[in-house]
Amino acid sequence: PQYDYEILFIDNDSTDSTRVKLRAICEKNHKIKAIFNAKNFGQFNSPYYGILQTTGDCTIPVCADFQDPIELIPKLVAKWEEGFKIVCAVKTKSKENPIMYFLRSCYYKLIKKMSSVEQIEQFTGFGLYDKSFVQVLRDLKDPIPFIRGIVGELGFKRTEIEYTQPQRRAGKTHNNFYTLYDAAMLSFTSYTKIGLRLATFVGAFSGFASVIIAIVYFIMKLMYWDRFQAGMVPLILLVCFIGSLQLLFIGLMGEYILSMNKRLMNRPLVVEEERINFDEKEIETK
């Protein structure tokens, strides 16, 4: 073979027989390594941490559900050999639930429109990363990393390869509305300013409109004192509308503050319970 290799599994606190099987595989082949997390640290932190632990000239992260086709690896390496530091695998089609694929497509387009940093549509993180990029990731020390945004932000020489995403081969996803919302808010608060700017603009517009309406109301009342009766219903609707806007933007600001708070706490990406087939010289990066 032209290249040597290492295979690193990072287990996010599986509750089945995954760890038993990984130990058996690692025992047979010392080029296969494993990290067992002390708990489930989420769909972003765990694979990101795994990337930081690799030692090769390049790294290719692959999800264990086989929705990232390993058949693309030779094509990824070929593009890397051409001089690209990052090779992004981008979905053009997917065999997953069509409704979910449509919603994800809308999400990608929305974030791309709102973000101040270039965002790659239908990029899940599957691809190839040169060791120079991986070293920059280590230096970032981001406690809540979003690899899809970081790729577009740092400006390394990059290309894309298209593929059709197959169905999940085994197991069942643990993603639900909360985890998907959490992922969306991570990208939204990390790479967009529109939430805060929108609150400012809507507040200014509402204030200006309120002054105009008040002046018009006052003039109409002076001109038609007995006949002009606005009643309570418009006032109640206006108060409810303004109150809902306030709650919406307070919630958005809360999401930004939560993101800042997590970064300031600077907690480790993951906490390891065990690692297998790592040399003592290999420094753990958290």
Regions found by a protein language model. Give the residues of each.
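A conserved acidic beta->alpha catalytic loop
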Residues: 11-20, 66-67
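Acceptor/aglycone-binding surface of glycosyltransferases and processive sugar-polymer synthases
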Residues: 37-39, 43-53, 58, 70-145, ...
